[in-house]
C-alpha cells in the first residue's frame, strides 16, 4: 500500500519576449508535489533559466534598455500539514540564483512559515513570515547608474477570515515589510 493520496509532476518551459518581440531568457522547471494519506504535502521544485537580456531592471531606459544577465537556477522545498481539524502549518526553504522568471546576479535564500488556526467553521486566523537574503542584489538607481547590495527582506502577514453562510465573507490582512540594502557597490553593465 502507498503512503501517497496523490502525486503530481509538472514540467514547465517558458519562452519570453518583450513588447518589441526581442527574445528574453527562457526557463525550464520541474515540480514534484506529493500529497500523503495523513494530509501532509511535500513539494519539491527546481528550475533553470538561460542567460540573456533583462529589460525589467532598467525599465527600457533609452540609454540602457536592457542588462545582460547570467543564467539562473535553484530549488525550493515546501512542507504543509493540514491534518489537524483546527490548525494547519507550512514551512518552506528556497535557494536560488534569480527566479524562474526573473534574473539576478547573486544567490538568494529564503525560508518561510505559515500557521493557520480555525477555532470554528466561520472564522480563521493566520500568520505568515518570510526572511529572504540576497547577495549582489542589482538595483537600477537612475539613468545608467546601477548598484549591487546585500539585501535582506522580512515579510510578516497576519490575517482574519470570517464567513457567514455561503454569501458573506470578511477578510482583514495586515502586512509589514522590513527591507535593508547594505554594502553598496557600483555596477557597470555590459550590454
Language model features with spans:
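Exposed, low-structure sequence patches enriched in small/polar residues
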Residues: 1-191
Amino acid at each position: 500500500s502507498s503512503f501517497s493520496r496523490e502525486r503530481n509532476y509538472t514540467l514547465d518551459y517558458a519562452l519570453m519576449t518583450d513588447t518589441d518581440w526581442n527574445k528574453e531568457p527562457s526557463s525550464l522547471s520541474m515540480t514534484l508535489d506529493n500529497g500523503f494519506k495523513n494530509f501532509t504535502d511535500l513539494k519539491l521544485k527546481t528550475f533553470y533559466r538561460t542567460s540573456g537580456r533583462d529589460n525589467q531592471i532598467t525599465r527600457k531606459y533609452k540609454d540602457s534598455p536592457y542588462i545582460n544577465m547570467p543564467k539562473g537556477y535553484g530549488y525550493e522545498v515546501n512542507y504543509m500539514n493540514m491534518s489537524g481539524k483546527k490548525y494547519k502549518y507550512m514551512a518552506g526553504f528556497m535557494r536560488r540564483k534569480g527566479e524562474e522568471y526573473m534574473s539576478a546576479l547573486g544567490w538568494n535564500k529564503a525560508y518561510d512559515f505559515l500557521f493557520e488556526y480555525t477555532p470554528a467553521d466561520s472564522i480563521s486566523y493566520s500568520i505568515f513570515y518570510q526572511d529572504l537574503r540576497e547577495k549582489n542584489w542589482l538595483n537600477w538607481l537612475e539613468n545608467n547608474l546601477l548598484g549591487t547590495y546585500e539585501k535582506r527582506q522580512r515579510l510578516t502577514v497576519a490575517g482574519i477570515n470570517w464567513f457567514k453562510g455561503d454569501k458573506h465573507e470578511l477578510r482583514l490582512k495586515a502586512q509589514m515589510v522590513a527591507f535593508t540594502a547594505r554594502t553598496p557597490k557600483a555596477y557597470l553593465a555590459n550590454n
